[in-house]
Every structure is written in C-alpha cells, then in structure tokens.
Amino acid sequence: MSAPVCAPGRRFGGIARLYGNEALTRFAAAHVCVVGVGGVGSWAVEALARSGIGRLTLIDLDNIAESNVNRQLHALTDDFGKAKVAALHERIVQINPACEVVEIEDFVSEENLPALFRRPFDFVIDAIDQVRVKAAMADYFVRHKQPFVLSGGAGGQNNPALIQSADLSRVTHDPL
C-alpha cells in the first residue's frame, strides 16, 4: 500500500513556520546518514523524516527483537525478526513519501569505513554502541571533513538532568 502524496507545504508547514521556507527547501535537498538505527537512531530517523529531510541512508545489520520494544520506535509485534532498516524505511515513506531511503544492512567496522562513506553526506549521525568503531568513525569523519554528530548511551544513568553536552575532547567518565 503506498501513501498518498500531498504537497510538502501542507505536510511540513509546521517545519517551514519554525525554520522558514528556505530551511525547508534545504532539508528537502539534504542527504543524512544514520549509523545504528536502534534505541537512539530509530528516534533520530523519525525526527529527520518528520522534518522533511529528502534522502536518508540507514546503516544497521540488526533485526527487531521483542527486547527492543521498550526503547526502539520501530519495535512492534508484527515486525519482530524484520531488519531494522527495512522497518524504518516503511515508516519513513508513510511520513514522507517523497523521501528517498537507502537501506544498508551492514555493521560499520574500521575496515569498511571507506566503502560505506566514500561519498560525503550532508550529515552523519552516529548512533552505535561500539566504542572502538565510534572512535574510528570520528577519526575518519574529521580527516575527511564529514560533518557528523556522535551520540553516547546513558544506560544505567538515572538523572537525565545531569547529562551535559560537550566537545568529545572535554568529555569525562565515558570510554571514548
């Protein structure tokens, strides 16, 4: 079943009112890559789709499991066992039928960084758990002048008011 296409101005009018028409046009032309589409990445993807981003590349090799239900947007009973990138692709086109979605069922590793990121994206969101790969991606992106944001987990933390944002070089109490 395909979603009916409606005018972007109607579908994303709130985004235009918030950021302006010029920004909405830039969003529609943007290509954003999200690496890791689980607990953090699935929510980032949904926000990007609802903001009118025109092209999304999703990278993850994992499948949806019952244990994902408490924290992952795409974790629904009917989708258990489905590739996370495929489930999110289905959601994205329901939100923004004009969005082009590229699914890459793979885990990022130090070895495949050049192949996965050979062309620049407008922006990359790192939402993976593996510290070694996070560090390798950050190094690669800095060397290749690829704009990115690195997200960290807060597992086991119980006071979100204490979370602070900082440049990675100033972060403490984190394996990175």
Predicted features and spans:
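E1/E1-like adenylate-forming module used to activate ubiquitin-like modifiers
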Residues: 123-176
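Glycine-rich phosphate-binding loop and adjoining beta1-alpha1-beta2 segment
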Residues: 53-96
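Hydrophobic/small residue at the entry helix of a nucleotide-binding pocket
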Residues: 40
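N-terminal charged helix/coil linker that caps or initiates catalytic domains
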Residues: 1-33
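Conserved N-terminal Rossmann-fold NAD(P)-binding element of oxidoreductases
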Residues: 34-36, 59
